[in-house]
From Swiss-Prot:
Function in brief: Affects cell viability at low temperatures.
Gene Ontology CC terms, in alphabetical order: cytosol
Source organism (scientific name): Pseudomonas fragi
InterPro entries xref list: Cold_shock_CspA (IPR012156), CSD (IPR011129), CSD_CS (IPR019844), CSP_DNA-bd (IPR002059), NA-bd_OB-fold (IPR012340)
Subcellular location: Cytoplasm
UniProt keyword Cytoplasm present: yes
PROSITE patterns: CSD_1, CSD_2
GO molecular function annotations of the record: DNA binding
Protein name: Cold shock protein CapA
Length: 64
C-alpha cells in the first residue's frame, strides 16, 4: 500500500468530475476523479486547495 502524500489541486472541473493534483514533493501531476474524493455531500476540489492522497496506478497512469 502506498503512503499518504500531500499536494495542491492544479485544477478541477466540476462538470466533468475530474482534475489534477500537483504532488508537494514534486513529480508528475496526478489525475483525480470525483469518486476518489473522501467527503460528504458534493464532491469537488478547488484550485490551489491543499489535499492529502494516496497515489496508485490507474488504467492511464498514476492517479490520486
Amino acid at each position: 500500500m502506498s503512503q499518504r502524500q500531500s499536494g495542491t489541486v492544479k485544477w478541477f472541473n466540476d462538470e466533468k468530475g475530474f482534475g489534477f493534483i500537483t504532488p508537494q514533493g514534486g513529480g508528475d501531476d496526478l489525475f483525480v476523479h470525483f469518486k476518489a474524493i473522501e467527503s460528504d455531500g458534493f464532491k469537488s476540489l478547488k484550485e490551489g486547495q491543499t489535499v492529502s492522497f494516496v497515489a496508485e496506478k490507474g488504467q492511464k497512469g498514476m492517479q490520486a
